[in-house]
Amino acid sequence: MRSVTNAFGNSGELNDQVDETGYRKFDIHEGILFCIELSETMFKESSDLEYKSPLLEILESLDELMSQLVITRPGTAIGCYFYYCNREDAKEGIYELFPLRDINATFMKKLNDLLEDLSSGRISLYDYFMFQQTGSEKQVRLSVLFTFMLDTFLEEIPGQKQLSNKRVFLFTDIDKPQEAQDIDERARLRRLTIDLFDNKVNFATFFIGYADKPFDNEFYSDILQLGSHTNENTGLDSEFDGPSTKPIDAKYIKSRILRKKEVKRIMFQCPLILDEKTNFIVGVKGYTMYTHEKAGVRYKLVYEHEDIRQEAYSKRKFLNPITGEDVTGKTVKVYPYGDLDINLSDSQDQIVMEAYTQKDAFLKIIGFRSSSKSIHYFNNIDKSSFIVPDEAKYEGSIRTLASLLKILRKKDKIAILWGKLKSNSHPSLYTLSPSSVKDYNEGFYLYRVPFLDEIRKFPSLLSYDDGSEHKLDYDNMKKVTQSIMGYFNLRDGYNPSDFKNPLLQKHYKVLHDYLLQIETTFDENETPNTKKDRMMREDDSLRKLYYIRNKILESEKSEDPIIQRLNKYVKIWNMFYKKFNDDNISIKEEKKPFDKKPKFNI
């Protein structure tokens, strides 16, 4: 049966809208609403935050989030609101730092100026928000806040696309608001929660707890997890379980904000045909695993018209090469066949295409094979996709693909697929490989298999060292490398997003400083140590390498024999490397030139 989803689950699902005839494509336009409840403890310095207040940590995290989104997703809308605020420009106790609009330089500058004023001591958070601890009669009721959230998301903004993914980042450290003991008010909040759910608004909660004051999430779990229920027809749990109302420590505020910003971008949706004869079909959708942002590729062409900047658009024309006449409306598509040109109508062209493939995107299983015989490094010619079930059109897809995942894992096999991911592309071969048991992601990886003409042969070498002469040395080098790696552990695994692209960061820092009017000074007489510190601040990869280098150098001076081994292992590794490198050079020097045939002058 069709799975019941709710708006408090995975944010990527909000874009999976499907009509009755087929899959529909949507451009993701995400809106993030920061809602922060002010309290006495929000202004107090915390040792977990290097003696910063949680409120300042939230503001700095918001500034960093906007700096990242303007690079990766500049079309994202962000709004920031504080409730329980006594400022004169606050409406019903809700103060708007900036409204829910697409990221722009004006809002970024306003936030940046506020942070500069706070760091220089020109103003304090207490003074800026005019916060005064008063009784509950001044506190903003959650029903007013929830209604305000809904109205904000439903507001139509001229010149701004409709939001397809709506999220609320809710920050509070008050676990017992005034509504907690009011049964009628709780019921009203549940009804408002249903309204938010119906309008596809989901929550990312940041319930902040402290060592001396842990956060009790009973109240918020009661009102926010209302959308989680069981599918009565199948007895299966809902695909999503509502928002996480688990409290967090103050020190995790920034990392969680930057992690929660991620949205799952659907790359494609299509049916997966398991058996064409019996019409056994399930729905799947694919996500992009990684994207690589590049500097200087995002720009627009504009022109000035009556002192107003307008965006310029390109248009293609077809011209007669002799007369220069515009023949765009007279062109037709023909297929050359010998000395004839065959002109087919759209319907006839469709019939020809359907003779060898389907019109819409599809994937069809044509067989199974051992993983060891199918997954090869030289077949890696395209980006892989992560495949998960899609219950939107084909009910029972989750249960079916879960069984397929278990069987493929048990038999150590992969599925061979034939199909295409876009309606206007040509069919290709694919391998559908299950994720490993240790893998954090549970699903399938889809790899395109190249055709023969897409595989390039390795060049023939005049001299090639197969390593047989150094087999023992290679084995020893591997053991030494394993010992060295034992001293350096990635606690949370390798996450590419944790290592920023220095070229990309430099490009956008120049734009950022220019728009926000931030003065930058460059000392021509910069000392080597100062230059090194500056480079490590700008490049976190260099900073990590510098840390590893220092750890190796410090191990040589250590009195602990176990720590001293690290430096000894590195010296042995360098010895092997130098030996292999010298042998390779000697092989090249011994290479004899070809014997040239004598030339005869006639």
From Swiss-Prot:
Q: Which residues carry this modification: Phosphoserine?
A: S370, S371, S372
Any GO BP annotation: recombinational repair
What is known about its processing and modification?
Sumoylated by MMS21.
Q: Record's GO cellular component, any one? A: chromosome, telomeric region
Q: Does the keyword Nucleotide-binding apply?
A: yes
Q: Which InterPro entries match?
A: Ku70 (IPR006165), Ku70/Ku80_beta-barrel_dom (IPR006164), KU70_core_dom (IPR047087), Ku_C (IPR005160), Ku_N (IPR005161), SPOC-like_C_dom_sf (IPR016194), vWFA_dom_sf (IPR036465)
Name the SMART domains on file. Answer: Ku78
Any one Gene Ontology MF annotation carried by this entry is: ATP binding
Upon changing F368I, the result is: In strain: YPS128
Enumerate the spans annotated as Ku domain: 268-483
Question: What EC identifiers does the entry list?
Answer: 3.6.4.12
Q: Which UniProt keywords apply?
A: ATP-binding, Chromosome, DNA damage, DNA recombination, DNA repair, DNA-binding, Helicase, Hydrolase, Nucleotide-binding, Nucleus, Phosphoprotein, Telomere, Ubl conjugation
Q: Where in the cell is it found?
A: Nucleus; Chromosome, Telomere
Q: Which residues form a coiled coil?
A: none
Q: Its domain of life?
A: Eukaryota
Task of the protein: Single-stranded DNA-dependent ATP-dependent helicase. Involved in non-homologous end joining (NHEJ) DNA double strand break repair. DNA-binding is sequence-independent but has a high affinity to nicks in double-stranded DNA and to the ends of duplex DNA. Binds to naturally occurring chromosomal ends, and therefore provides chromosomal end protection. Appears to have a role in recruitment of telomerase and CDC13 to the telomere and the subsequent telomere elongation. Required also for telomere recombination to repair telomeric ends in the absence of telomerase.
Q: Which family does it belong to?
A: Belongs to the ku70 family.
* Additional note from the record: Present with 892 molecules/cell in log phase SD medium.
Q: What protein does this entry describe? A: ATP-dependent DNA helicase II subunit 1
Name the gene behind this protein: YKU70
